[in-house]
Regions:
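His/acidic/aromatic-lined binding-pocket segments of jelly-roll/cupin-type domains
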Residues: 88, 94-98, 143-144, 151-152
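Double-stranded beta-helix
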Residues: 117-146
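Short, conserved beta-strand element in jelly-roll/cupin
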Residues: 91-106, 110, 121-132
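A short, N-terminal "cap"/entry segment at the start of jelly-roll beta-barrel domains
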Residues: 18-91, 184-192, 196-199
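Conserved metal-binding segment of the jelly-roll/cupin
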Residues: 145-166
Length: 199
């Protein structure tokens, strides 16, 4: 009984110390507004993907104080085998995929075979996910069979590659950009992009 009381007292003290030490913490993004992207806007990006076939479309790039976060829509068509040198790696930006529709096979590993730097002028480097490499293959890769509803988290520095897509795969991607290497994109820029790419 005495041991139980001591454990409970220790937990209470730890909680109180934690609460007191947390009182001096300031928000990392003071007075920042929330960002809302309605389903109707996401659907417009899906329509652009079907009409013009851009694989990766940035919808927003948001400053959160100490970091930035990007929200993108990615649509990939049927793939029977991977293209040469299609392993991608991003040095500073992590990615989270939420699969909306379709299915495919993705491989991931931090061990990239014959990695070569992407040029700074590359659209992906400049506008989407910052500096990184493309590689010929992955060593010790893990394979994920992705389908609607699945989530895949790819840390910065980890190579990733679709090796097969059954019919298509469409996913919402959230990029975590702590070094702020990706330019900002607001709602007005999104509207302009959609107007320019409507068919």
């Amino acid at each position: 009984m005495r041991t139980s009381i001591l454990v409970i007292a220790a937990i209470a003290v730890a909680f109180l110390v934690g609460r007191l030490s947390a009182q001096g913490v300031e928000p990392s993004c003071k007075l920042c507004s929330a960002v809302y992207i309605p389903a109707s806007e996401v659907e417009q990006y899906v329509a652009v993907a079907h009409a013009t076939n851009p694989i990766d479309q940035q919808m927003r790039s948001i400053d959160l104080g100490r970091a930035r976060v990007q929200v993108a829509l990615v649509h990939r068509n049927k793939l029977d085998a991977p293209a040469p040198r299609s392993v991608a790696e991003h040095d500073l930006v992590s990615e989270v995929y939420y699969i909306l529709s379709g299915s495919g096979t993705n491989r991931t590993s931090p061990e990239i075979v014959d990695a070569q730097r992407r040029p700074a002028t590359d659209r992906a480097v400049r506008d989407l996910n910052g500096p990184g490499t493309n590689g010929a293959d992955l060593r010790n890769a893990e394979t994920q069979q992705l389908k609607a509803g699945d989530v895949l988290v790819i840390p910065a520095g980890t190579g990733h590659q679709f090796t097969k897509i059954d019919d298509h795969i469409t996913y919402l991607m959230v990029r975590v950009d702590p070094d702020k290497v990706v330019p900002l994109m607001d709602e007005a820029a999104s509207r302009k992009y959609l107007e320019q790419n409507r068919r």
